[in-house]
Amino acid sequence: MCMNRFFTENRKRGFAYRLKQSTFNTQYVDIIVDSKEPRYYLAIECKSLKGKRLSFSSNFHKDKDGVHQIDNISGFISYTGRRGFLAAEFRGGPKNEAYLMPWELVLEYFDSAASIPIEAFRECVVLERITGGYRLPAGLPEE
């Protein structure tokens, strides 16, 4: 996993784990990262998509009560005190591209647009493609 590789390579203390999806349990985000460093105490939602835009209507869902996934994730981030990120992998071009976008920026787009273009992701944290996955080359920006 990208974050665990980062912790190992940079001799930092932290651990990332993917939450299993279940029909009967609520899963707020895909990856939880625990670390004593607040910078790496994270909640990460992952999206893998074809195309050049991430759509809030087709790439996210509403729960049985009609609450949008963005709102549920935002509540989880606020309640737990974690830093939120959206990991987006864009597939189908000459090469796959992946990025981490801070959750605050995701919310800005959610409040003002129907989708987020790939160009906006390219201005965020770039994940380097390596054999078997991705690598976080430089760490995360301070809050």
Model feature map: region roles:
Residues M1-K12, Y99-E143:
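Helix-rich interaction surfaces within compact, conserved domain-sized segments
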Residues Q27:
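Beta-rich catalytic cores
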Residues I31-V33, Y40-K52:
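Conserved catalytic cores of phosphodiester-cleaving nucleases, focusing on short active-site segments
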Residues K36-Y40, G93-N96:
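Short, solvent-exposed loop/turn segments that connect beta-strands within catalytic domains
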Residues L49-N72:
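Mg2+/Mn2+-dependent nuclease catalytic core
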Residues S74-V106:
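Nucleic-acid nuclease catalytic cores
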